[in-house]
């Protein structure tokens, strides 16, 4: 159904792409969500968050590369969005780049509980304890 809709509709909006990407991710089809992402010229916050979620679902080195490239191109204003940061941390941790995730986490001024959870993914126990200790002292 999603594929039929995406091929028949002439002009797609960001909302359309977002709904389709969310559907693909929810139905365990992250590669299709990423394929859609490549078709979008100017993604908004929601689209970028979905591509990070798709990358986290894959957990591959290719997904890590896409996460980093998207992060580089992402407007700096998006860095203050805790939902996007949580998705970035989830993707980085799931794809295995703990150091980069830690640097983003440590530079964030507004740490949220979901961000703590994302940092726990794939992180050795000792690093989790350090994160909790840092959080309690800040």
Where are the model-predicted features located?
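Alpha-helical tandem repeat RNA-binding modules
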Residues: 1-138
């Amino acid at each position: 159904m999603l594929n039929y809709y995406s091929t028949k509709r002439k002009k797609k909006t960001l909302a359309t792409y977002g709904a389709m990407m969310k559907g693909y991710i929810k139905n365990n089809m992250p590669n299709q969500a990423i394929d859609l992402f490549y078709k979008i010229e100017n993604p908004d916050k929601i689209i970028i968050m979905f591509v990070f979620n798709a990358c986290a679902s894959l957990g591959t080195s290719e997904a890590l590369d896409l996460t980093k490239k998207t992060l580089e191109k992402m407007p700096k204003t998006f860095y203050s969005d805790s939902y996007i940061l949580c998705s970035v941390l989830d993707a980085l941790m799931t794809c295995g780049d703990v150091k980069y995730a830690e640097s983003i986490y440590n530079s964030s001024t507004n740490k949220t509980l979901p961000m703590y959870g994302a940092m726990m993914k794939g992180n050795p126990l000792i690093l989790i304890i350090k994160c909790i200790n840092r959080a309690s002292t800040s």
